[in-house]
């Protein structure tokens, strides 16, 4: 369950490492796997002082940016139709643009199969594994 102020890992190569949930899109209080949220980038990936100029040119987002995202993993248990229960070690998301296309070109780590039911096929095709 993702709600306001929840911190999530960003698992794509868009340049964000840690994001904070600012809003759940739609008339819902909590977001689960496959739901769209609005996030604020809290920490940038690879933004060290030595390579700041090189890394800032390669990143697509920077700290403080407000972006849309899709939740791909949650620590909250999710019950599936076949009776199995899945639970991940962290809360994670993938940044998307307003049209729903992923900002990054690669996804690191597993994503939940619930994305298939909610029609996020582009994210599923980029992910190395589904759980």
From Swiss-Prot:
Keyword tags: Mitochondrion, Ribonucleoprotein, Ribosomal protein
Known partners and oligomeric status: Component of the mitochondrial large ribosomal subunit (mt-LSU). Mature N.crassa 74S mitochondrial ribosomes consist of a small (37S) and a large (54S) subunit. The 37S small subunit contains a 16S ribosomal RNA (16S mt-rRNA) and 32 different proteins. The 54S large subunit contains a 23S rRNA (23S mt-rRNA) and 42 different proteins.
Primary subcellular site in the record, as a coarse category: mitochondrion
GO cellular component: mitochondrial large ribosomal subunit
Source organism of this protein record: Neurospora crassa (strain ATCC 24698 / 74-OR23-1A / CBS 708.71 / DSM 1257 / FGSC 987)
Entry-linked Pfam families: Ribosomal_L14 (PF00238)
Protein name as annotated: Large ribosomal subunit protein uL14m
NCBIfam families: rplN_bact
Gene3D superfamilies: Ribosomal protein L14
One GO molecular-function entry: structural constituent of ribosome
UniProt-listed GO biological process terms: translation
């Amino acid at each position: 369950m993702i709600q306001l102020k929840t911190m999530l890992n960003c698992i794509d190569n868009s340049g964000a490492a840690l994001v904070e949930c600012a809003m759940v899109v739609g008339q819902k209080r909590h977001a689960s796997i496959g739901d769209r949220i609005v996030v604020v980038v809290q920490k940038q990936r690879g933004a060290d002082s030595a390579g700041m100029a090189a890394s800032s040119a390669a990143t697509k987002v920077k700290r403080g940016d407000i972006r849309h995202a899709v939740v791909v993993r949650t620590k909250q248990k999710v019950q599936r139709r076949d009776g199995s229960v899945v639970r991940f070690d962290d809360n994670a998301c993938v940044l998307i643009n307003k049209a729903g296309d992923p900002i990054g070109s690669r996804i690191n780590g597993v994503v939940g199969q619930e994305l298939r039911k909610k029609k996020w096929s582009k994210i599923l095709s980029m992910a190395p594994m589904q759980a």
